[in-house]
UniProtKB/Swiss-Prot annotation:
Site positions per UniProt: Plays an important role in discriminating NADH against NADPH: 75
Membrane-traversing stretches: none
Protein name per Swiss-Prot or TrEMBL: Enoyl-[acyl-carrier-protein] reductase [NADH]
Species of origin: Marinomonas sp. (strain MWYL1)
Residues where substrate binds: 225
Gene name tied to this protein: fabV
Enzyme active site: 235
Length: 400
């Protein structure tokens, strides 16, 4: 079929398999161009492995460190009538290139919050790898089905305390609007922490450790975002921020458990990038359009792959000066360039000046739009979008 983008709100309902594969190949080529990661991991589990930072982590481990990887994700395959999710095509492409290069790669498609997923992963590790030495936790799901009760808990993107009013972009019409969001209730904050906090990460690490599949010196990392005062009301000081604080709590608990086997846990605080998750957050598209422009002008702009390679090579597996690599909460800070005062001050000055007439000129909004479409495999260089594409992509995957 000939596949074109169809956008509804902050989701593109179609995806392009060839474009997704090309995206993955570009990330792999970038990783290889940077060279091997010194002292990198060799057997890696990535929970949430099909897009964004999770996919980049799997690529960094496999193609930067020669690691065997197991990826867990929840995606829909394409059929002869309908395209699958981008994450399905990303994972199919990863599997294809990994196999071409003789790397071990196995994938599990199912609910990563479930006990079944944990049991399946543990069996697979025992059968194929014996033990693993790194666990990346990169889930960004709006809902969580509780493994014991089956209750479905939903997260919210809301402020705490008072309504949040701010300039934002209506990304369907490309115009500036005033967004207003009512504050979260106590129940909504608690639910958001249940879904987006550190509890599930702890369940995974406990299950893996109890099963004896974690090697001596195992490292684990989960991803967070703090941002600046521009986005704090909706993010760090909002319901999502409470969930991310819970991630810090979990990190400390897991770290003390892993210390028994000479390992450790960290939260990695990453920069803002265009992902399906970030496009759903009011204010983020406008902030991203601004911060991209400022960081590009200063020569410090990074995408998912750049960030994750830097995290592996310069933070997580940099054994030269470990004390300097974390902040006072033992977090790996990869948002250091974004949060530089000169970058944030430029964004603050730009914020009140942006209007409908100058949106494209004063910010990198076009880059934001391009990056958003690329998430779904569209607008990728070297892909013929007028050609027929096969929406069915099969690869070695265990479906739960």
């Amino acid at each position: 079929m000939i596949i074109k983008p169809k956008i509804r709100g902050f989701i593109c309902t179609t995806t392009h398999p060839v474009g997704c594969e090309q995206n993955v190949r570009e990330q792999i080529a970038f990783t290889k161009s940077k060279g091997a990661i010194e002292n990198g991991p060799k057997k890696v589990l990535v929970i949430g492995a099909s897009s964004g930072y999770g996919l980049s982590s799997r690529i960094a481990a496999a193609f930067g460190s020669g690691a065997a990887t197991i990826g867990v994700f929840f995606e829909k395959p394409g059929t002869d009538k309908k395209t699958g999710t981008a994450g399905w095509y990303n994972s199919a492409a990863f599997d294809k290139v990994a196999k071409e290069e003789g790397l071990y790669a196995k994938s599990i498609n199912g609910d990563a919050f479930s006990n079944e997923a944990r049991a399946t992963v543990i069996d697979l590790i025992k059968q194929d790898l014996g033990q693993i030495d790194m666990v990346v936790y990169s889930l960004a799901s709006p809902v969580r089905k509780m493994p014991e009760t089956g209750e479905v808990v939903r997260s919210v993107l809301k402020p705490i305390g008072q309504p949040y009013r701010s300039t934002a972009i209506d990304t369907n019409k490309d115009v500036i609007i005033e967004a207003e969001i009512e504050p979260a209730t106590e129940e909504e904050v608690a639910a958001t922490t249940t879904v987006m906090g550190g509890q599930d990460w702890e369940l995974w690490m406990s299950a893996l450790q109890e099963a004896g599949v974690l090697a001596e010196g195992t490292r684990t990392v989960a991803y967070s975002y703090i941002g600046s005062d521009i986005t704090w009301p909706i993010y760090w000081h909002g319901a999502l921020g409470k969930a991310k604080e819970d991630l810090d709590r979990a990190s400390a608990a897991i770290d003390s458990q892993l210390a028994k086997i000479g390992g450790g846990a960290n939260v990695a605080v990453l920069k803002s990038v265009v992902t399906q998750a970030s496009s759903a957050i009011p204010v983020m598209p406008l902030y991203l359009a601004m911060v991209f422009k400022v960081m590009r002008e200063k020569g410090i702009h990074e995408g998912c792959m750049d960030q994750i390679y830097r995290m592996f090579a310069e933070r997580l597996y940099n054994n030269h000066n470990p004390a300097e690599l974390t902040d006072d909460k033992n977090r790996l800070r990869l948002d250091d360039w974004e949060l530089r005062e000169d970058v944030q001050q430029a964004c603050r000055e730009l914020w009140p000046k942006v209007n409908d007439a100058n949106l494209f000129a004063e910010t990198d909004y076009q880059l934001y739009k391009d990056e958003f479409l690329k998430l779904f495999g569209f607008g990728v260089d070297g892909v013929d979008y007028d050609a027929e594409a096969n929406p069915e992509a099969d690869f070695e995957v265990i479906t739960l």
